[in-house]
C-alpha cells in the first residue's frame, strides 16, 4: 500500500526494512506523501538543520505551517533523530486537527498529562493503533518504518 501510493520507498529496490528505525524527517515525509504532498503555506524555514536541498524540505515546511510540528526547539527540526511512537502518532493527530478526546487513559504507560496523551487516545479510538499490548502503547519506543506505515495505513486506507 505505502509503496504503491508513493508514501514511502524501500531502502533498496527490493527491500523495505520494516524494523529499521524511522527518523523525524522520514516520519514527516511519509505523512506529507500520504496527505498528497500539499504545498507549504510558507517557504519561511525556521530551522538551521533543514537545508533547501534536503529531500524532506517541503514536507517539513508543510508540517510546520500546519502546526504538525514545531521542531525540537525554535531553530532545529532534528531531521536525523530517531522518532518515537509518541511523536509519530502526535504528528498524525495534529494533521487531522487535534480533535477533542474523552478518555486519555487508554494505555497504562501513557500519563494523562503527557503531551501525546490526547494523540494516543485518539489513535486508539480511531483504530490507528492498538498499542504494543492490550495495556501498553510504548510511547518512547523507537518508531520503526513498519510502525509508521501501519499508523498511516490504518488512518488513510480505512
Residues covered by each model-derived region:
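Feature responds to low-complexity, polar/acidic, surface-exposed segments characteristic
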Residues: 9-25, 33-58, 69-86, 94-116, ...
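The feature marks the first
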Residues: 1-11
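A short amphipathic alpha-helical interaction element
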Residues: 2, 31, 63, 92, ...
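Phosphate/pyrophosphate-binding loop motifs in nucleotide- or prenyl diphosphate-using proteins
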Residues: 6, 67, 127
Amino acid at each position: 500500500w505505502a509503496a504503491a501510493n508513493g508514501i514511502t520507498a524501500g531502502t533498496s529496490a527490493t527491500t523495505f526494512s520494516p524494523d529499521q528505525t524511522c527518523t523525524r524527517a522520514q516520519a514527516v515525509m511519509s505523512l506529507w506523501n500520504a496527505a498528497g504532498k500539499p504545498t507549504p503555506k510558507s517557504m519561511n524555514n525556521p530551522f538551521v538543520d533543514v537545508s533547501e536541498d534536503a529531500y524532506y524540505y517541503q514536507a517539513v515546511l508543510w508540517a510546520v505551517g500546519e502546526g504538525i510540528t514545531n521542531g525540537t526547539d525554535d531553530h532545529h527540526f532534528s531531521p536525523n533523530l530517531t522518532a518515537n511512537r509518541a511523536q509519530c502518532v502526535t504528528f498524525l493527530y495534529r494533521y487531522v486537527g487535534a480533535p477533542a478526546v474523552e478518555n486519555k487513559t487508554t494505555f497504562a504507560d501513557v500519563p494523562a498529562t503527557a503531551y501525546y496523551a490526547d494523540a494516543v487516545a485518539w489513535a486508539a479510538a480511531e483504530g490507528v493503533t492498538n498499542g504494543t499490548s492490550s495495556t501498553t502503547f510504548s510511547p518512547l519506543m523507537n518508531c520503526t518504518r513498519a510502525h509508521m506505515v501501519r499508523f498511516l495505513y490504518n488512518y488513510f486506507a480505512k
